[in-house]
A protein has these predicted regions:
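Acidic, mature catalytic/reactive cores of soluble proteins
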Residues: 1-224
Length: 224
């Protein structure tokens, strides 16, 4: 949501994209980009080795395609602190230009997805639905209602309950939920899943997910 002041203004949204393994960075990579757009819906194939198009859409403004536009030397402070290479180049496929009238207020959503029907996605509805789901996650546990903690500790507890949700994902190959060992880089490891099983799934009363996680691990047993 944006509210303009008393003069005409222009908001420019410039998405940056990349295609690489998460253990590496692109510094001197030449992207072989193919893109097409219809209105504000953009389809991008970022590299000849990529078989999956990326789709982008903005609820407002107008899209302007760029050619050979690179955002250079993005700096990663944490990578520097860890002793890794800390600068990377990204590709800028184009920009969304949004005009704002004096004192105008707008709700603008930008959606990037692998789903082709991206123009049908209402960003505001997605956000509101997720906020409602997150509230359900917190209160369905029953932990908050029975807590006698002060507000500061209660906020920390809510954040912790929400954090557990990041580790529970759907595994399409089995059609079951599983626990990943470290979001988003690691896959599901049986040992880590079972170590965290009680805290992630039982204390939070995710019993159906707990059942699916056990079934997933059973299927992964050697010769099982």
């Amino acid at each position: 949501q944006i509210k303009n002041q008393n003069a005409e203004a222009k908001l420019t949204l410039a998405p940056v994209v990349n295609f690489r393994d998460f253990h590496s960075i692109n510094k001197d990579h030449q992207f072989n980009v193919e893109q097409s757009h219809s209105g504000n819906k953009v389809r991008i194939v970022l590299d000849k080795n990529s078989e999956t198009p990326i789709y982008m859409n903005c609820s407002d403004g107008r899209y302007f395609k760029h050619i050979d536009d690179t955002f250079r030397n993005m700096y990663y402070l944490r990578e520097e602190e860890r002793g890794f290479e800390a600068e990377e180049n990204h590709y800028v496929p184009g920009v969304y230009s949004i005009n704002l009238e004096p004192n105008e207020e707008k709700e603008i959503t930008f959606v990037c997805s692998l789903e082709e029907n991206i123009e049908e996605i209402d960003g505001i509805k997605v956000i509101n639905k997720e906020l409602l789901r997150m509230t359900g996650i917190i209160y369905d546990t029953g932990i908050i209602q029975n807590s006698k903690m002060n507000d500061k500790k209660l906020d920390m507890l809510k954040a912790l309950i929400l954090a557990t949700d990041n580790f529970i994902v759907n595994r399409p190959s089995f059609g079951l939920h599983t626990v990943i060992a470290g979001y988003p880089w690691f896959l599901d490891w049986g040992r880590d899943s079972l170590i965290s099983f009680e805290g992630l799934l039982l204390l939070t009363k995710r019993y159906e997910f707990a059942k699916e996680v056990l079934l997933t691990n059973i299927r992964d047993i050697k010769y099982g």
